[in-house]
Swiss-Prot record:
Subunit structure: Monomer.
Protein name according to UniProt: 2,3-bisphosphoglycerate-independent phosphoglycerate mutase
Residues that coordinate or bind Mn(2+) 1: D397, H401, H456
Alphabetized InterPro entries for the sequence: Alkaline_phosphatase_core_sf, BPG-indep_PGM_N, Metalloenzyme, PGAM_B_sf, Pgm_bpd_ind
Ribosomal protein is among the record's keywords: no
Top-level taxon in the UniProt lineage: Bacteria
Record's catalysed reaction(s): (2R)-2-phosphoglycerate = (2R)-3-phosphoglycerate
Length: 531
């Protein structure tokens, strides 16, 4: 490791900070953001794509934090699990998947039941309802009773979307003649990722007990919740029919995104589980759609795709130090997802985890832990040890998901101030900053009907290059512009160019930096900026 002072490249990821011209319902346009506004005016900037085919998703599919960080860290467009699994359903290879076939055979030999647990929506961020329909057909082909444990969305979809989804699901099950909905739980409970075990427990108890059955249709559970002003995300776990997870059964958790599926999975499979009191259900065959954690002892229907020569790996191979920093809500994204699904850090990779505030929803604490993250990263920059610093600010995404416009504006203004601190710290040591986002959210919070919008968007995001005195852009100096057709996969090649490191062949992204035309250089006026 180099001992001389290092001028870092600082990648600042403003989670959920999209770009949209329209100001109505736009928390970012409504907020007071003097730092970002000044940087946008003074430095090379562009808009980049973060959704659909630009990040390996189907055309028109909104991006998300997992996909965003995966593409940024990989330096290439990574085909996403949504596409991979959807293709398996459409082409029929799902029905010959060896892990799923073996599960069905084992359950049938035991005269057990097959359970499908997952987020039931077309959001495409954590799961897709079409994948459940494929699983129901799988159960039908094997002559197995299928018990469906619905997790309702309301976060990656409109807050009251579940009623329509459940109506269609009930009709599809009736037509199929296979499968029944036995429990309904909001994702707030079943998909917690912050070790609020009381939430996970509420969903787990309903799924594993036939007590307290409320003889309702699933759609009626949603409608009764709406009548109490409870949206899909917060539907209280409810059992509506017999069909608890019991010894001899098999389970498929069909979420493909790992982070919010881990806690509930642990409760089912971990013999040393300590989140809450429960007896381990055994024998129980448990399959997850993707690998939720390398340490989990369960089947995986779609094993991970290996990515080689990603950004963190290249930095480490050249003997340089790097730092990843975020609060709890986005820590996995700057580490696990940024590193292509690897849990272990690369040599020379340090990590800073700042706990997120323990509140029910983040509109109650719009600043979240941004100030603490900022101070920790500022100190790290001042050490001049790291060639690359990656920091994520969760506020505009996490508060944006609440649908509370005023709170989201506060969140954005907090982040703007934090960016100012990091710009000052980085430029003081000659470092260069790249300021961008992983997907849109907070720029669109009210839909065309005037209702709160809590999901992500397909809008582009800003990308700003703040060039430092000791970390100049090679061969260009101040005479640079940024391409207009870029995407998240282009960020890693841009960083490598600034660090003067070779771009591996596996990295198919292209640097966003291009030389400005001669005429533009002549007309460019130097800007004096003080933050």
């Amino acid at each position: 490791m180099a001992s001389s002072p290092v001028a870092p490249v600082v990648l600042v990821i403003l989670d959920g900070w999209g770009y949209r011209e329209e100001t109505y319902g736009n928390a970012i346009a409504s907020a007071y953001t003097p730092v970002i506004d000044s940087l946008w005016q003074a430095y090379p900037h562009t808009l980049i794509h973060t959704s659909g085919k630009a990040v390996g998703l189907p055309k028109g599919q909104m991006g998300n934090s997992e996909v965003g960080h995966l593409n940024i860290g990989a330096g290439r467009i990574v085909p996403q699990e949504l596409v991979r699994i959807s293709d398996a359903v459409e082409e029929g290879s799902l029905f010959s998947n060896p892990v799923l076939v073996r599960l069905c055979q084992t359950v049938k030999e035991r005269n057990g039941k097959l359970h499908f647990i997952g987020l039931c929506s077309a959001g495409g961020v954590h799961s897709h309802i079409d994948h459940l329909y494929g699983l129901v057909e799988l159960a039908k082909r094997h002559g197995l009773p299928a018990c469906i444990h619905v997790i309702t969305d309301g976060r990656d979809t409109p807050p009251r979307d579940a009623a329509g989804v459940l109506e269609e699901l009930e009709q599809r099950l009736k037509t199929s003649g296979c499968g029944r909905i036995v429990t309904v739980s909001g994702r707030y409970y079943a998909m917690d990722r912050d070790r609020r075990w009381e939430r996970t427990e509420a969903a787990y108890r309903v799924m594993t007990s036939n007590e307290h059955i409320q003889p309702l249709r699933a759609v009626d559970v949603a409608r009764q919740s709406y009548a109490q002003d409870i949206g899909d995300e917060f539907i209280v776990p409810t059992r509506i029919a017999a069909g608890a997870v019991e010894p001899g059964d098999g389970v498929v958790f069909f979420n493909f995104r790992p982070d919010r599926a881990r806690q509930l999975t642990q409760a089912f499979i971990d013999p040393n589980f300590s989140g809450f009191e429960r007896a381990l259900i055994t024998p129980l065959d448990f399959v997850t759609f993707t690998q939720y954690d390398a340490s989990f002892n369960c089947g995986v229907a779609f094993p991970p795709q290996n990515l080689s020569h990603i950004l963190g790996e290249v930095i480490a191979e050249h003997g340089l130090k790097q730092l990843r920093a975020a609060e709890t809500e986005k820590y996995a994204h700057v580490t696990y997802f940024f590193n292509g699904g690897l849990e272990e850090p690369f040599p020379g990779e340090d990590r800073i985890l700042i706990p997120s505030p323990m509140v029910t929803t983040y509109d109650q604490a719009p600043a979240m832990s941004a100030l603490a993250v900022t101070q920790a990263v500022k100190k790290a920059i001042e050490k001049q040890e790291y060639a690359l610093v990656v920091v994520n600010f969760a506020n505009s995404d996490m508060v944006g998901h609440t649908g509370k416009l005023a709170a989201t504006i506060q969140a954005i203004e907090t982040v703007d101030r934090c960016v100012g601190v990091l710009v000052e710290a980085a430029t003081k040591v000659g470092g260069t900053l790249l300021i961008t986002a992983d997907h849109g959210n907070a720029e669109y919070m009210i839909d065309e009907d005037g209702n709160p919008w809590t999901a992500h968007t397909t809008n582009p995001v800003p990308f700003i290059l703040v060039e430092g005195e000791k970390r100049k852009v090679p061969g260009h100096g101040g005479h640079v512009i940024l391409r207009k057709d870029g995407c998240l996969a282009d960020i890693a090649p841009t960083i490598l160019e600034i660090l003067e490191l070779p771009q591996p062949l596996e990295m198919t992204g292209r640097s966003l930096i291009v030389s400005a035309p001669y005429e533009m250089r002549l007309n460019r006026t130097p800007v004096s900026l003080k933050i």
